[in-house]
Regions:
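C-terminal cap/loop subdomain of S1 sulfatases and analogous C-terminal strand-loop tails that border
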Residues: 68-74, 101, 108, 113-116, ...
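Active-site-proximal cap/lid insertion segments
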Residues: 1-109, 122-132, 178-185, 194, ...
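Non-transmembrane alpha-helical segments in soluble domains
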Residues: 34-37, 41-48, 52, 116-120, ...
Length: 235
C-alpha cells in the first residue's frame, strides 16, 4: 500500500500516462499484482524450507516458472497474448544445489516446453527422451557445462482464427510479428531489444532486410506446422 507508483512509472516509457484508460489501469492494479507475487514468494519459501528441514533440498530440482506474463496496461494492453516482453518473458529459476552453481544467465533462450527433455536429461533419462520431441534438451547449459547458444528462434502464435491474428518469432536480439485481418497482412512489427528494451520503436520500415529474413524464417515454420497463415506472407 506504500508503493510509490509514480516513481515506478517514471522509468517505464511503455506505461501510458496517468489519466488515460490503460495508464489508470496499471496504477490501480499494480499494488494488487505485487501483493499477489509476494504471496507466491512466501509460499514457495514454505516449500523450500520443508525440503531443507527434511534433508531433501540439496538433491531436489526445483523449477520456478510461469505460463505467461501480463502487460498490466503497458503498451495499452491489459493482459497477455501479445508479443511484448511483459507478456512473453517469464521467470525461469532452476535450483539444484548439489549440481548447479548459483548464477544468472540472461542469454540462454529457453521456453516452457524445453523443460520436458531438459528435466528428463538432468534426472538421468536422456535416452528415454522420445525422438518425436521437437524442443531442446538444455541440460548441459543449465548445469553450466556448455556455453553453446541455441540459435533457434522461438515462435509466437496468437489468432482469432487462421485468417486473423498475429504470428511472429523471437530471437536473442529481436522480436518480429505480423498481423493479418481476413487473410491480408495489415501490420508488421520489428523491435531490436538490444537498443530498445521497452519495445517503443517499430523499426520494420527502416529494416527491410531484417523483415525479409524473419519473414522467410517465419513462413518456413508456419508451412512446417501446417498453418495456413503461411500463405499470407510474402515469399
Amino acid at each position: 500500500k506504500d508503493m510509490d507508483v509514480e516513481a515506478l512509472c517514471a522509468n517505464r516509457p511503455d506505461i501510458p500516462a496517468k489519466g488515460t484508460e490503460m495508464g489508470n489501469y496499471f496504477r490501480n492494479n499494480i499494488r494488487n499484482y505485487y501483493a499477489c507475487i509476494t504471496g507466491v514468494d512466501e509460499n514457495v519459501g514454505r516449500i523450500i524450507e520443508t525440503l531443507k528441514s527434511n534433508g531433501l533440498f540439496e538433491n531436489t530440482i526445483v523449477v520456478f516458472t510461469s505460463d505467461h506474463g501480463i502487460c498490466m496496461g503497458a503498451h495499452n494492453a491489459a493482459g497477455k497474448d501479445i508479443f511484448y516482453e511483459e507478456s512473453m518473458r517469464i521467470p525461469m529459476i532452476i535450483s539444484w544445489p548439489a549440481k548447479i552453481k548459483p548464477r544468472k544467465d540472461d542469454r540462454l533462450m529457453i521456453a516452457f516446453a524445453d523443460l520436458y527433455p531438459s528435466l528428463l536429461s538432468l534426472m538421468g533419462f536422456r535416452k528415454e527422451i522420445p525422438e518425436t520431441v521437437q524442443t531442446f534438451d538444455l541440460s548441459r547449459q543449465i548445469l553450466g557445462k556448455s556455453k553453446k547458444e541455441v540459435v533457434q528462434p522461438y515462435y509466437y502464435v496468437q489468432f482469432d482464427n487462421h485468417a486473423t491474428g498475429y504470428r511472429g518469432l523471437r530471437t536473442a536480439t529481436h522480436t518480429f510479428a505480423v498481423h493479418a485481418t481476413n487473410g491480408k497482412i495489415d501490420e508488421t512489427v520489428l523491435f531490436d531489444r538490444t537498443k530498445d528494451p521497452y519495445q517503443m520503436d517499430n523499426i520494420a520500415g527502416q529494416s527491410p532486410h531484417l523483415v525479409r529474413q524473419f519473414n522467410k524464417q517465419l513462413k518456413a515454420w508456419l508451412l512446417h506446422t501446417n498453418d495456413s497463415f503461411a500463405h499470407y506472407l510474402k515469399p
